[in-house]
Amino acid sequence: MTSSASRPRRDTPTSPVGASADAGNGAAESTEKAPSSKAGRNLPVAIAVGLGMGAVILVSLLTVRQTWIAIVAVSAAIGTWELFGALHRAAGIRLSRVPVLIGGQAMIWLAWPFGTEGILGSLLVTVIGCFLWRMRLGAAGFVRDVGASMLVLCWVPLCMSFGTMLVVPVDGAARVLTFLIVVICSDTGGYALGALFGRHPMAPKVSPKKSWEGFGGSILFGTVGASLCVALLLDDRWWYGLIIGPLLVGCAVTGDLVESLVKRDLGIKDMGSFLPGHGGLMERLDSLCTSAPVAWLLLVVHVPPA
């Protein structure tokens, strides 16, 4: 378990609190500012931005549900571009930007008419395109650069293309809402219980702020949210949520940890600054990307489309 004196140094490297001779005052200050220091954000602004994004998504799903595809496509493009910038600035990686951007959009848009065949076909063509695009720069750094391009391609557009698949059935709006609500419940439960009761670090070398107590909150809130959504939105057996909830929460938390690991490796705090109070859009997409394919699969299995 990390001590209270070490946390301020890790979360805010330039802060003098950790080096203060008055350890009692330093601990009190750290405890008093816990909500903002743990989030590292302007909380009111972050909440306002989050509510605005939620309103746009909700209106689109309740009016013309196909507009969800455009939201996914734009979000994937922004997230992909943020990853490009972070990898290039921090590590000098030369990515296959054009093939990944074009191929990523193809996967998302072709998932609507062609399903998994459209996703797989676009993925294969994009992989070959990445090889050819990077080949023109020579052998130096080829494996590193192509590997990073594959990471971006699979992490963002490939995973998010399954978010498109969620909206395809007639009850697609309810499926997308179920997916989003479970992930939001997971984030909310993890933040709330982690802030209140967090004592045991979950992955101290990856994300020191995450605790097992917070993970328990994510499981609890996510499972309750999943059960309610399955019963009320999808009109099916509520106990399916006992399966869907924990699995989606596990994927969402994994995505969050993966992004934390990438940022630590690159030595950066945020992927970008697109969203006021949040950082980059990838700070919001990380858990959604890794849970979208699993959400689609679980709902197809347990709540088959009509």
Regions found by a protein language model. Name each.
Residues L297-A306:
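Juxtamembrane boundary at the C-terminal end of a transmembrane helix
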Residues D265-L288:
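Interfacial loop-to-transmembrane junctions
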Residues C289, V294-L298:
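Hydrophobic alpha-helical transmembrane segments of membrane transport and translocation systems
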Residues T2-P246, G250:
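Membrane-embedded alpha-helical bundles of polytopic integral membrane proteins
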